[in-house]
Structures are given as C-alpha cells and as structure tokens.
Curated annotation (Swiss-Prot):
Entry's family note: Belongs to the class-II aminoacyl-tRNA synthetase family.
Annotated catalysed reactions: tRNA(Thr) + L-threonine + ATP = L-threonyl-tRNA(Thr) + AMP + diphosphate + H(+)
Single annotated GO MF: threonine-tRNA ligase activity
Short name of any one Pfam family annotated for the protein: tRNA-synt_2b
Quaternary assembly: Homodimer.
GO biological process per UniProt: threonyl-tRNA aminoacylation
Residues annotated to bind Zn(2+): 298, 350, 474
Originating species: Pyrococcus horikoshii (strain ATCC 700860 / DSM 12428 / JCM 9974 / NBRC 100139 / OT-3)
Protein name in the entry: Threonine--tRNA ligase
Length: 625
C-alpha cells in the first residue's frame, strides 16, 4: 500500500464518471463532499496487499493515526487514489481494504470522511504547507517478496533520523519550524519537500510539455520507463552541455578517464560499497554471473586509483568521467520527464585529498566551481536552493567552515544534521532546483567520503614514504545533464506563467538566427546571408515555406529563435538586415557584420556545434505528429 498524507485546510470532491465497470454504489448525496481542517490520506492498494489484507489495514490505520497526532488533526479523509502505484490490487480487494481502513479510523474516535471508489473525480485541496503537511508511507505485508535493496537505502528509509535547520549567512542556526520564510518562498518549498520525502510525481511538470512541443526529448515506449529518446535539437543541447561541463572540469584540473558500465556483484569492495550507497540497481546476467549497471563513475575511478602509484605530491588528484550512461532503477511512480530518470548522463569527478584540511579546501573550491558551471547555463543562486548535510560532531568542529559556504552563496540554506553518521560521507552539499510543482531536484553536489579509500585499497605515500589512505571528494559540478535541461525548461515555464518571453541561453539555442525572406524572390539573398552567418560558426536556418511573412515570424517566435532576420528589397539594396531580437523585443536595422559581432561576443567561451537540422525548413521532417 502507498499512502500520500496531506494536512489541509479543506478537501472537496465531485464525482464525474465511472472509472471501472463495477464502482462502489453511491447515493446522489455522496457524489459531492467536503471536509475542513483535515488530514487527507490518498491511498493506492497494491497487488502485494492481497497476501495479507488484515495486516495492511492494521498498519495503515496505525500510520495514519501517527501522522494525525503529529499534525493535531481530528478529521481524516480517505481518498482512493490509483496513481501512487503501477502494481494495483484487484478492485474488489482494494475497495474492501479501503472500507476497513475507514472503519478502523472511525473506531479509534476520528471524524472520518471518504471519497467513493471506482470513479473519476474532480477535487480541490488546500495544503497547509508546513514541514509535516506532506508525508508519504509505504506498507508491505510480512513475508511479501521485496526487491533487492541496498542496506543504505533501507536505513535511509527506515532508520535515518534527521534534524532540520536553516543556517543564515550571519551564522545563525534556526530550527526549521521557527524560521521566518518571508521573502524565501522557494526555500520554504524546498524544506517541505525534503522533510516530507514524498517523491511521487502526482502530475506532469510543465517542462515535459515544452520538451515535446519543441521536439527536444520524448518518451521511448520500446524501452524501460525512464529511458528517453533525443531528437536532433535535444541531442544538440545535451551534447553542448556535456562538452561545456567537461571543459570546465578539465580546466579545473581533472584528468579524463573512461570506465565500464557494468561491474561484478561479487567483487568484495564493490559489494560493500553497494550496501553503503542508497540507490536501486539494474541487474545483468552474463552466463551464471550477476553484474550491476553502474549508478555513478565511482567504481571505475576507484579501481583505477587502487592500481595507481600515488605520492603526496600528486594530491589533490582529480579524475573525471562523463558517464553516458549511469543507471538507477528509480520507483515507477517517481519517474518524471527529465527530472527523475532510470538512465542518465552524469559528469562525475573524484578528488583524492591527503587530509581533512585539504579536503575542505577542495570542497570550497568545488562549491564555487559548481556555482560557475550553473551560471553558464543560465541558473543563478536565485534559481536554486542549497542543502548542506553533516553530523552533529562535524558541525561542532567545523562551524566556521560551514558558515563560510553560506556566505559564499549569500542567502539562507537548509541544514540536515544527524546525531551519527549513516553514510560513507561526513559532509555533503547540493544545489537544488525547485520546479513549478514545488518538487526539488539536486543539480550540483560534492561529498567528502571517509570510507571508500580503505574499502578499495586506495593509498598514497606521504612525506616519510609511509602508505596512507586519502579522503575522497565526489563531485558533480552540474548534476545529471538531463536535470540541467529540466531546470532550464522549468525556469522558462515559470517565465511564461509570469507573462514573460521564454528563451534558451544563446549558446544552447539549436537555431540562433532564422533568416526569413519576405517572398520567394529574395530566397537567394536569404541564403547568402545564411551562408555568411554559418561561415562565422553561428547556427542559422532559412524559412523558405510558401507562407505569409507574419506566419513565418510567429513560427520563429514560437520556437524561441533568439534572432529573426527579415530580408526583402530594401535590405538587398542597402546591404543591411532587419533584426528582431528576442531577448529584449527590440527591432532594428544593422549590418550583417555587426550582428555577427554581437552574437560572437555573447557566446564567447562556450562550446559550439553546427546546426542539427537541414538549412531549409521545407526539407525538415516532423518528429512528432
């Protein structure tokens, strides 16, 4: 059973139509309903619940009561909700289990309401928005077969106790429920998301519509969910991002390597690490041996480091790989467009440091590197929220260092503190993007790892020739490339909601300039202009469709083309061009050389790739119907 619990000002519903052949019989009165000051329990009954319905009912009632007591709710509303799971129980079983949950809560003295089972319903809900307002629970009957899950993930889901704070640039550590979030709305949303740990995607985020409309990325029905296909424009954007991040990391001082995508389950060091890393794996059989698909570049880089001869003079030693792909078998209900995938591209750098002071110095440098990388893709600190995670002991011993990081970002950050260390790292930060559905996704991240050097036998020789274990920093300065695309598109979706013009960064725009002849008579001149732009390494195309000028301009606007160049008799005779600049809406006349200079200045320092589609619009296929 999956339960999503939302503490609400109210919920109201209205039955619209039957969703199954034999829905629960209801009266006219039951076709509508409302309850105020309520804990709403959205429930999916799963196939595995059929093995022991009574136990599932008992545990569900217990979990709901526990949350109701925490949020001080006397009213509870049971809402059948099939969208939390892809493995649903039979309708007859689900209906009976939900009825018993309803009765069990009533017997415990709660005022209980319920929505009817088996119908399409419209509903309105007003979530209270405090840190405990959104929580999720999973109930599995005893003896039910569970998927193989690493010990670290089990601990994270069952044993981990977190203490949440907000840390200000002034060094003030404030309990999260006592912090005044006025002026920090996104931080409030991020804190709620992190504390509730609800990762279920209830509806489609706006970036999905954009990635489909612009023919960038699409779902691939012929593959496992969470594996995507990229059309030419999307592949260009992804490729440029991959090149950009790789160049930044190599410029920082990393050595690029390449390692396998699968590893032996029985390798002693890998087996131990698997149980310390909170992720689900894909499993591959080769003969009678079992392998797992990598979920990061750690394994390959650690095995290279184990075999290398390393001196203290080589430290900090930085190694990097862009993994295309890494794999994590995320839960089906958590998959969401480009935000959460099962196959993804991860820029992954590991740094060996001789001691904690050197590790902290690298940590701070990589914090700044991550800010710089995100700035290049159009994301500033206003666009993301920071989480820093550590143990209570680390905080006491390194308080000034943590506060220094917060001063660098220049705004309050979320702190997750543990009484004891659950994972292989002692310190971690992430830059998290909060999207239009108030879901958060980690982009940049760095961790200081204190376990894996010894686990993998990675050593260096110190000044006295003695072997020592280094500390290891795990760094992704951008996060998964797909997540960067998600954040860019979600940011544009937000601008659209505010009535502003969306636009990709110029260096990432698949087409940077569109040349539009006012009629077929000026097509040759348009092609001449396009040739000059292409010769200057600017991505350009020509709209040669037999349509009115206004329609062509509207199409270019709809495609977010940064520069629209219109050419006709006047431009041909004068040797000038008429330009519409999307960034500020300005329309002006200029010489072609000036436009080239303007664009080249704006994209300086960023990678370039040629146009991903044919020059003429009339020669292009349509990838989506």
């Amino acid at each position: 059973m999956r339960i999503l619990l939302i503490h609400s000002d109210y919920i109201e519903y209205e039955v619209k139509d039957k969703a199954i052949k034999n829905p629960e019989p209801i009266s006219e009165e039951e076709k509508k309903g409302r309850m105020d000051e309520v804990l709403v329990a959205f429930i999916s009954v799963e196939k595995v619940d059929e093995t022991n319905p009574e136990e599932v009912v008992s545990k569900a009632v217990e979990e709901i009561i526990n949350v109701a007591s925490q949020v001080k709710a006397e009213n509870v509303f049971v809402y059948p909700f099939a969208h939390l799971s892809s493995e649903l129980a039979k309708p007859s079983v689900a209906q009976e289990i939900l009825r018993k949950v309803y009765e069990g809560l009533k017997e415990k003295g709660y005022n209980v309401g319920k929505a009817p089972f088996g119908y399409y319903k419209a509903f309105k809900i007003s979530c209270k928005g405090h840190p405990l307002a959104e929580l999720s629970r999973t109930i599995i009957p005893e003896g039910a077969k569970e998927e193989e899950v690493p010990e670290a993930l089990k601990k994270e889901e069952t044993e981990l106790v977190s203490y949440w704070y907000i840390l200000t640039p002034e060094g003030e550590l404030i309990e999260v429920d006592k912090f005044d979030f006025t002026g920090y709305e996104n931080l409030r949303k991020f804190a709620n998301y992190e504390i509730s740990k609800s990762r279920i995607a209830e509806k489609e985020p706006p970036h999905v519509k954009l990635m489909l409309e612009h023919e960038l990325v699409d779902y691939e029905p012929g593959s496992d969910p969470g594996n995507l296909r990229y059309y030419p424009k999307g592949r260009l954007i992804k490729s440029l991002l991959e090149q950009y991040v790789t160049e930044k990391v190599i410029e920082y001082g990393a050595m690029e390597v390449e390692t396998p995508v699968m590893y032996d389950f029985e390798h002693p060091a890998l087996e131990k690490y698997l149980n310390r890393f909170p992720a689900r794996q894909y499993i591959v059989l080769s003969g009678d041996k079992k392998y797992f698909l990598r979920f990061a570049a750690c394994f390959g880089q650690f095995l290279i480091s184990k075999d290398a001869v390393i001196s203290y003079r080589h430290l900090p030693l930085r190694m990097y790989e862009l993994t295309r792909y890494s794999f994590r078998r995320e839960k089906r209900g958590e998959l969401s467009g480009l935000r959460r995938l099962r196959a993804f591209t991860m820029p992954d750098m590991h740094t060996l440091a001789k001691d904690l002071e050197q590790a902290k110095d690298e940590f701070k440098k990589q914090f700044k590197l991550s800010m710089e990388v995100l700035k290049g893709v159009g994301l500033t600190p206003e666009d993301y929220e920071v989480a820093i995670r550590f143990t209570e002991d680390f905080w006491k011993e390194n308080r000034d260092f943590i506060v220094e990081l917060v001063k660098i970002i220049g705004k309050p950050v979320l702190i997750e503190m543990w009484k004891q260390r659950f994972f292989y790292f002692i310190l971690k930060f992430e830059f998290n993007f909060v999207d239009n559905l108030d879901k958060a996704a980690a982009l940049s991240t760095v961790q200081i790892d204190v376990e894996n050097a010894e686990r993998f036998g990675i050593k260096y020789y110190d000044e006295n020739g003695e072997e020592k274990y280094p500390l290891i920093l795990h760094c992704s300065p951008s996060g998964a490339i797909e997540r960067v695309m998600y954040a860019i598109l979600e940011k544009q979706a937000k601008l659209m909601q505010e009535g502003k013009k969306p636009m990709l960064p110029l260096w990432l725009s698949p087409i940077q300039v569109r040349v539009i002849p006012v009629s077929e008579e000026y097509l040759d001149y348009a092609l001449y202009i396009a040739g000059k732009l292409e010769g200057a390494r600017i991505r350009v195309d020509v709209d040669d469709e037999d349509e009115r000028l206004n329609k062509k301009i509207r199409r270019a606007e709809k495609e977010w083309i940064p520069y629209i160049v219109v050419v006709g008799a006047k431009e041909k005779e004068s040797g000038t061009i008429t330009v519409r600049r999307r960034e500020d809406g300005k329309q002006y006349e200029t010489r072609l050389e000036e436009l080239i200079k303007e664009i080249k200045e704006k994209v300086e320092g960023f990678p370039y790739k040629p146009r991903p589609l044919p020059l003429l619009l009339s020669k292009r296929p349509k990838f989506r119907g």
